[in-house]
Amino acid sequence: WIAKQALDLGAYGIVWPHISTVDQARNAVAACRYPRLKGKPLYEPAGIRGDGPTQAVRYWGITLQEYYERADVWPLAPHGEIFVVLMIEDTTGIANLDDMLKNVPGIGAVLIGEGDLSQELGYPRQYEHKAVLDAMAQIVATCKKHNVVVGHPHVEAANAERIIKEGYRYLMCAAPRSFATLEKARGLAGRS
């Protein structure tokens, strides 16, 4: 129900933490979708979001009917403007990621929760440790296989080039470091 509340206030997407199974991934996407009649186009995953987006309509600056037309998950619905991001933060999630991306339409991106992942691997916050980097590389490879954007949560000017070369396309950086990092990453990605 928390996804409904955030979306009803006008959020354009939800980042779902600790997604480790196909069922959890399906539920995450379903929570961001309105129900449809069985057999209708784009039925699966069946939506479970309740109605009531009056704040979202005002925030988005559109009519209620326009909101209903756009309030579906992209890329499942090409016209959809709701973005579903799954956080993979443990080895169970890594093991199940291929099945998630193969069987659950509507996942817009995968974000690696490297803090929790590094904890489970026994190297807390040692983001450059080989075991952590290897686990993250598995996630990147799986996302590339399914052409799903993969995100890195700790981009700095010092690691931006490596991260972009590794295939990350959704880059996050902390506010105090963001301007220099943003400019460097934009240049590396050819977006200056």
Model-identified regions with their sequence ranges:
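Glycine-rich phosphate-binding active-site loops on the catalytic face of alpha/beta enzymes
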Residues: 12-24, 110-119, 169-187
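Conserved anion-binding
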Residues: 1, 9, 13-105, 114
